[in-house]
């Protein structure tokens, strides 16, 4: 019985890793041993940062809302508390978008919130 080598399989596996490593510096884009380490680390970073992105955007929205609310004499925490009292259910993403792009709509929300402080 002849020996079955995994030539095609390993070549395809190497090709897949080297394709993912395209654009890396030095031997990381051409040497399989180095490339596999770099690709694995890059995938770990990607996994971690997909979760961190949600955290970062929430912080950005809060900063934008806080800056816009301070122009009207309120603080972020007071504003959010007042929104809860008035039962206005708008999430932070939409509030930040209103604060940046639709200041008239945001001002009307702030005025409604001010009435309940």
Curated annotation (Swiss-Prot):
It comes from the Bacteria. Pfam families: Ribosomal_L20. GO terms for molecular function: rRNA binding; structural constituent of ribosome. Keywords: Ribonucleoprotein, Ribosomal protein, RNA-binding, rRNA-binding. The keyword Ribonucleoprotein applies. One of its GO terms (cellular component) is ribonucleoprotein complex. PROSITE patterns: RIBOSOMAL_L20 (PS00937). One of its GO terms (biological process) is ribosomal large subunit assembly. PANTHER family: 39S RIBOSOMAL PROTEIN L20 (PTHR10986). HAMAP family: Ribosomal_bL20. Binds directly to 23S ribosomal RNA and is necessary for the in vitro assembly process of the 50S ribosomal subunit. It is not involved in the protein synthesizing functions of that subunit. Belongs to the bacterial ribosomal protein bL20 family. This is Large ribosomal subunit protein bL20. The gene is rplT.
